[in-house]
């Protein structure tokens, strides 16, 4: 199976590309944001650990039945904001749960649905290290000023200072460009973006004889996957040394 990791920066158009791949090309999309919400639903181990770690008072209850229906996300955000230790604790609770759901989703598409390709839509693909498990990593990118203007147009309540702060809170788009196998530039019109997406689909997803051949020979596919994993690990180590 070819696992494609799709990412980008805030307001660069990743969601637009993800929607195109799903609706126009009928490719299965596994959305990390959806899985992240599912991973902390009431009754899950991650949900219970969040309450026991950060406070039972975070629980939200149904007014009529008193049943726990979730937790106060803004309040949790305030408790971990600016506290690196607390943030790491939260990540250690949530990230493994999300990864497990992601593995199950990939296995479902492969073994049950018989898919030969799946797209992982992950905002923090490189930051989380999940790119190491992808056959191809794709970044949707724009120039920094275009990114800023689109964010201000999308979230009109933000000041320019706040918008720049949100962009700065993530890895820079140029840094992601360097790590990606494929870069889709989204600095023009919607029509131009669709053309670029089509070129990527035709080149990497449809016409890739290598992946088609490997799907028919699982041992070779596993060896190639191991090669990709090691290559990405070495690339990440070199990057960490430079930074």
Kindly give the residue locations of the regions a language model identified.
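Short beta-strand-centered segment that lines the nucleotide-binding/catalytic pocket of NTP-utilizing
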Residues: 27-40
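ATP-dependent NMP and nucleoside kinases share a basic, alpha-helical "lid"
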Residues: 100-153
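Walker A/P-loop
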Residues: 15
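ATP-dependent small-molecule kinase phosphotransfer cores
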Residues: 37-116
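ATP-binding Walker
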Residues: 12
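Small-molecule kinase domains that catalyze NTP-dependent phosphoryl transfer to phosphate-bearing small molecules
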Residues: 102, 132, 154-234
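Hydrophobic anchor at the beta1->P-loop junction of P-loop NTPases
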Residues: 4-6
